[in-house]
């Protein structure tokens, strides 16, 4: 399962680099949680949650970013910004489906703090 997650994050990273984003950190961890990718697009810090689902049961990948997960991401992002300097930021999601190898959905501003 961990390998599948690592592969999904690597695929998402390559996709976002092709879209012009720059990697700042991978798997940023603190006591509040973890952010899969921290990237930069222009002057904006982009916190990216990568989700892979094998099927659409229970809403697919997007539905798996529930309120508790969003709160952990927000706290972790605040921790990152306190240590690395404040900047405009947003939360994006990359949604991948095991059933559709070519299917990458990039949701910019997936949620707000």
Curated annotation (Swiss-Prot):
<dbReference type="InterPro" id="IPR011856">
    <property type="entry name" value="tRNA_endonuc-like_dom_sf"/>
</dbReference>
<dbReference type="InterPro" id="IPR003509">
    <property type="entry name" value="UPF0102_YraN-like"/>
</dbReference>
<protein>
    <recommendedName>
        <fullName>UPF0102 protein Mfla_2283</fullName>
    </recommendedName>
</protein>
<comment type="similarity">
    <text>Belongs to the UPF0102 family.</text>
</comment>
<dbReference type="InterPro" id="IPR011335">
    <property type="entry name" value="Restrct_endonuc-II-like"/>
</dbReference>
<dbReference type="GO" id="GO:0003676">
    <property type="term" value="F:nucleic acid binding"/>
</dbReference>
<dbReference type="Pfam" id="PF02021">
    <property type="entry name" value="UPF0102"/>
</dbReference>
